[in-house]
Design a protein with these regions (language model features):
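Phosphate/NTP-binding elements of NTP-utilizing enzymes
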Residues: 1-201
């Protein structure tokens, strides 16, 4: 993969909390997954969580492109179904499960006990703010750099992501906001993709 513009900036950014906001086919999910993989390879033994709010979406829409990235990089992962994580050859782990609890009384049950260096939430506009705040507390794995990545579709201006956590002016310390469009990812798409989408929408 080739990264350009704001996606390239995102890929090398080490800010603790990063919001890469973009529309359909802007490449944000792919870039985030490759960023996780780069972290796993650079820091053997690091633990990440990659997820969507829904477990079904995590398994059907996030796990496959993650596995594809690993395969392209020549990394053969071992799936541990008991704890829901992929283990890379160097001992790094990427947990892959949704955050939504079936029982609201156990809203944070999936997260409690996890010790992570990195968290990635795709489609983060679906994530309730209280779950986001709970996730922040999971960044505690000793000896590794910590980072929280989010890739939402553009939310409403009153959404907690835009209003409280990631203002466009980037005025919050240790928080970085990026906005990308499909044109920032045009070099990774077939020539007919953008014209087809423009015609459809």
């Amino acid at each position: 993969m080739v990264w350009k513009g704001p996606v390239a900036d995102f890929f090398v950014d080490q800010t603790r909390h990063i919001d890469l906001e973009g529309a359909f086919r802007s490449g944000k999910t792919t870039a985030a997954l490759w960023k996780i993989l780069a972290s796993c390879l650079a820091y053997p033994g690091i633990f990440w969580l990659a997820c969507r709010y829904s477990d079904g979406d995590t398994q059907s829409k996030l796990k496959p492109p993650w596995r594809e990235a690993c395969a392209k990089a020549g990394q053969r992962c071992v799936w541990h179904s008991d704890e829901m994580y992929d283990e890379l050859p160097n001992g790094s782990r990427v947990y892959l499960f949704g955050l939504k609890a079936q029982d609201q009384a156990a809203r944070y049950a999936k997260l409690r006990g996890l010790t992570l260096a990195g968290v990635y939430v795709d489609q983060a506009e679906e994530l309730p703010q209280d779950v986001y705040l709970e996730l922040k507390g999971r960044l505690s794995q000793s000896g590794f750099p910590h980072q929280f990545l989010l890739t939402p579709n553009p939310p409403d201006e009153n959404h907690w992501l835009a209003k409280q956590e990631f203002p466009e002016e980037n005025t919050h310390a240790h928080h970085q906001y990026y906005r990308v469009s499909i044109y920032d990812n045009a070099h990774n798409l077939a020539p007919d993709v953008i014209p087809s989408l423009l015609q459809a929408y």
